[in-house]
Amino acid sequence: MPRIAILTFCVGADYKKAMEPGLASKRAYAANHGYAFHEGGEDVWDRARPIPWSKFKFIEKYLDDYDLLFWSDADAIILNQDLRLEDHVLPLLPADKDLLWSFDACNHYNNGHLLLRGKSAWVRDYFRRAYEQTDLLYHIWWDNAAMIRLFEANPADKGKIETCRDHWLFNAYVFGSNNKATSPSDRLYKPGDFLIHFAGVYDPWNIYRMMTYASQQARKGKPLDPALLEAWRTAPPPSKSAADATLNF
């Protein structure tokens, strides 16, 4: 049996409180399936850079300790606890490749969820080179932009990376390429999917509200209401109590 770890990273007291539904889902998922779980915070944050860049160093810290590592951004919640990584995600990574990511619902390469082969010298070197792309420090996509640049520029890197275009398998969104939850051309989250990544939702308490709502609906086996999500996106709540007040239905 491969040794598998789930990794995530979350910084800031208020942000951690807002992301707690997602963080709790990952802790539970790891415990349910016997995976190790590592949650990084201020202890691994490189304060000379925007927070997302610390992803690389945090993953490198555990790279040699496991056979496989599944990275999940803090703004994601696991909704189907029954799907095992061994059955649902691992088969998507070919034996000759060391990194799996997705081409997302907004038609971009996305590193919000990654499957990495442990002990890979190439992964370590790739992340080191991505970390060195300092002209991208304040790019809107931060570390993701660095990974995309190397992927597109270097055939050797492209040869080690598997791109999953069935993004919903492990990186489902609720908003598509038109920035709406009613995006007819995009495959968005459906009940039974593994998880939701709330990429593009920038207000922490809005993410909290959407995570909590999605979890409620998943337990009931019900779909999400696109009109409600779109209304919420344009009117973020100012606090946890304000978010909770809109969930009483």
Which positions does each model-derived feature cover?
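Conserved hydrophobic/aromatic beta-strand scaffold that supports enzyme active sites
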Residues: 58, 99-101, 113-115, 195
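Short aromatic/hydrophobic "clamp" motif used to bind/position activated sugar donors
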Residues: 69
